[in-house]
Amino acid sequence: MNRSLLFITAVMMLSSCAGPRAASQKTTAEGILNRTGKSVEPDTASTNSSLPPGMDLRQPLSPDDAVEIAIWKNPQLRADLATIGLAEADLIDAGLLRNPRLDMLIPVGAKPFELLLSFPVEVFWQRPRRIAASQQALDQLAQSLIQNGINTERDARWAHADVVQALDRAAVAKQSAELRERVSKLTEVRLRAGDISELETIAAKTESASAGEQLIRFEHDVQLATERLRAVLGVASERPSLRVNSSPPPAEAPSPMEALLEKAMERRPDLRAAELAIATATKRAGWERSRVLLLSAQLSSKEVGTNGVLTGPGVSFELPVFNRNQGLVARADAEVEVASRQYVALKQRIAFEVAEAREQLVQELDALKTVREQVLPPLQRAVALAEDQYKKGDVAYLFVLEQNRGLIDSQLRVVDSEAAIRRAHAQLERSVGSRY
């Protein structure tokens, strides 16, 4: 009896000592910091509305400022990080032991007293596999959350670029409106002098009104882009006036495709998560196979006539005749195959994302260079000459209007190309998994 009690006690102590390793929210936040260079707000922060140290929403925000605030405060990222607590709870549950079972039969009439203590022995081969599967799932989730942090960085840079683009488009539209207003006034002067017909004056007024309407739309676009930036930063409920710094977009050409793809395969957290998904499914398949046999050690005490209470060991197990856990084993094997195929699909998607982002960046860099060096200078010269000739009465208003329209369209192309470069640069960083 003493040996049996000692055996069961030793099993319980040894099983409870093998604690799992947990990847906490703190370590996941450190992973985001390593990839983005920005910190997640610690759980010890005083209020949820705090900003990163040194940040002030009343000051103009650079793209890096926007990323720092978004990583710190973005509510969806913080909600995603909170889910790691669920995986940690699953890991804790995987390490718990099934409680011993005590059956006691009360002596009634001629029936003797009987006591039966059962302890699940299958813990020796099931618990390590269960813990390993839960640990892999936790690590997989941690890598996925690091990828969410990288996505948040990309979204912040996109939102910042949208605000800069909206502001620049509004500035170009303002110049266009002022120019058309000036031309409209010139036509009125020439009409009074009898140099042109009233029809040209009406056309000039119409163009001036259209330019004013376009300016109003672009100014509303500024407000819409600012609200999107607020949402990404996590300050949608706070109403300070947001301002942004409009710095030139990166002008350097990206690295060769082979180098970017190699770095992406090495650095992408979601690819690492896909690898861990295969390991998780494999561990789970091993765990499901270990559940075929359920074995319990028993300690039985029974009153036997005049001999008093006799105690002795025993075993109890299920006979795997009908149910050998075939369904869950087959499901676990299928999960391994699914995870493997998803891993291959993700590698293909990463290769496409890197190639697409790089090609977009190169395309917009080339387009911006062409417009700036070959399109804008002659248009600016043509507009200046056309306005001078119109004042002298040598050309018609429509000629001036066409020259100005071409210049405004080219200036908008510059603004759009600069914004596209900022977005493509952010997307390429996200596709690679870090700064490239």
Task: Tell me what each language-model feature is.
Residues 128, 198, 308-310, 324-326, ...:
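Outer-membrane beta-barrel proteins
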Residues 1-72, 219-263, 429-436:
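Terminal intrinsically disordered/low-complexity segments used for targeting and assembly
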